[in-house]
Amino acid sequence: LRWQERLAQTLFAHLPRSLAGAQRLGWVLGWLWWLASPRYRADLAGTLATAGMTNPRLHRQAIGACGVQIVEALWVWQQPWPDVLDTVREVVGWEAVEAARGRGGGLLFLTPHLGCFEITSLWAGERLPITILYRPPRQPWLAKWLTAGRARGGVTLA
């Protein structure tokens, strides 16, 4: 096994049951990754500079947030579907979706990778059939987890 797969297996085996616990773990891992990888530090600094984010406080937040995003996705993929749906606290604008469905025809959701976007499709798939267009991961070993975690409820992958 490659080291990335071994790390992912270890994370899966030891993920906290709570989303808050997973987020704390992700914050720590984001910082460890940043400390351990000169290439990642350079890439992140370049990305933030390109975005015009020069505030050191924002840099520190981004370091932790990158780890949180990765661990949140793993958490969502691993948890039972009802437990994931229970984490949704507020939905804004769903009435527009219902109105569009009432007029017939299809809908296209564009979901940016902000926050824990992995939950968005599962929540929508609970209410209507949904197909996700995605690019399979470059790491073949990751595909089994991604597929199992995303293709649940009314969600189909394409």
Description of each model-found segment:
Residues R103-A158:
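Catalytic core of membrane glycerolipid acyltransferases/transacylases, capturing the structured
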Residues L1-T111, A143-G149, G154:
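Membrane-anchoring hydrophobic helices of lipid-metabolizing enzymes
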